[in-house]
A protein has these predicted regions:
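Phosphoinositide-binding peripheral membrane targeting modules
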Residues: 62-105
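Acidic, Ser/Thr- and proline-rich intrinsically disordered linker/docking segments
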Residues: 2-63, 97-143
Length: 143
């Protein structure tokens, strides 16, 4: 599956972030904002990527492995990271462009993040609910 940078500068999309390409990271940070300083808490609890837009779902379906994911809080939003085989993919989001929905599913709780170009469903253990809610509030504002 090709994930070439075909969208306009600053457009939300799925990025292959495996390699240290400064131009690619500049575009990712143009969307989500720069990383927070090292002394600020910026990582989410561990999440499982369950579903996503067609682009994300095609990658998730490539292997039967559990797709662990995490969110990194940035100055203006967050970046979702997940791995497929040896590649690391990311979806940057800008605060204000995201709609958040919470739900329950069997033994897990789920978080759905909706944006214009990318939608994902993430699962986490119910015991992590407060930590995930705090992260989402810090990254995307009150929901």
């Amino acid at each position: 599956m090709a994930t070439a940078n075909t969208k306009p500068f600053g457009a939300e999309m799925l990025w292959n972030l495996t390699y240290a390409d400064p131009d690619r990271w500049a575009e990712v940070y143009a969307i989500s904002g720069k990383p927070l300083p090292w002394w600020k808490k910026s990582g989410s609890p561990r999440l499982r990527l369950l579903d996503g837009s067609a682009e994300v779902q095609a990658l998730v379906d490539e292997t039967s492995d559990v797709k662990w994911a995490n969110l990194q809080r940035t100055q203006s939003g967050a970046i979702l990271y997940f791995r497929v085989r040896l590649e690391v993919y990311g979806v940057p989001w800008k605060r204000g462009d995201i709609q958040v929905k919470w739900a329950g599913r069997d033994d897990d709780a789920t978080l759905q993040l909706h944006a214009k170009d990318q939608n994902v469903t993430l699962a986490f253990a119910p015991g992590q609910l407060k930590a995930v809610q705090a992260f989402v509030r810090d990254a995307f504002g009150p929901v």
